[in-house]
Amino acid sequence: MKKILAEIAYDGSIYHGFQIQPTKPTVQGEIEKALMKINKKKVKIHSSGRTDKGVHAKKQIITFDIKINIQLNNLKKALNAILLKNSIKILKLRYVKNSFHPRFSAQKRKYSYCILNSDNYYPWEGYQAHYVNKKLSISNLNQMAKTLIGKHDFTTFSCIKDKSKSKFRHIYFAKFKKRGKYIIFEIIGSSFLWKMVRSIIGTMLDIEIKNESISTFETILKSKNRNLARTTAPANALFLERVYYE
């Protein structure tokens, strides 16, 4: 039995996160149900990470094993015939070594956050974006983002329920970019704590909106005090962009 890697994309709006939950709709639950229809037996999938409720993915990585003999192209078509109506799409399928694990083999992960920073927009343009009516300074936001680069203790931006033994994470890239009426924040790190990216975004935006000193963000980061973090930014504007492997 060969291990199959799948690149998948999904709209997380209707799901209670990626990880399976017995009584709530999840991305993992829908994919495993689709695989069971095709395989006729239960199939367990493994992912590169668990996105929270409402968070989207442009290229999430999962792996699974199935016993039936089917060409990958036909398997992709069969899965998409079931999953597309549920806002999940299989982008690619390929075989990988049995030693490969989508989470533990990953080197880096990239997320993006979409901020709608204009009054000139259609109602549906805010569907997967966080609307901020005050004009934001890209320069100020990027000065705060620079302090994230390197290895830091991110206790301040962790969730109380996060069970990670270490709160240290390595951030390789963090930058805001203007794209028309949107401001896009991109961040690449070794991995991320539960709700860490949204907590970082929410804090930076709050400091900028209130015209506080840029140095406030670094002070909050170094404090290792969860109570100093500001409002967590909404989930609907966060995207898992890609996962990096060797």
UniProtKB/Swiss-Prot annotation:
Disulfide bonds: none
GO biological processes: tRNA pseudouridine synthesis
Superkingdom of this protein's organism: Bacteria
Keyword annotations: Isomerase, tRNA processing
E.C. code: 5.4.99.12
Residues annotated as the enzyme's active site: D52 (nucleophile)
Classification via Pfam families: PseudoU_synth_1
Molecular function as annotated in GO: RNA binding; tRNA pseudouridine(38-40) synthase activity
Binding sites annotated in the UniProt record for substrate: Y111
Reactions that this protein is recorded to catalyse: uridine(38/39/40) in tRNA = pseudouridine(38/39/40) in tRNA
Enzyme class per UniProt: isomerase
HAMAP family in alphabetical order: TruA (MF_00171)
Main function: Formation of pseudouridine at positions 38, 39 and 40 in the anticodon stem and loop of transfer RNAs.
Subunit structure: Homodimer.
Homology family: Belongs to the tRNA pseudouridine synthase TruA family.
Protein name, entry field: tRNA pseudouridine synthase A
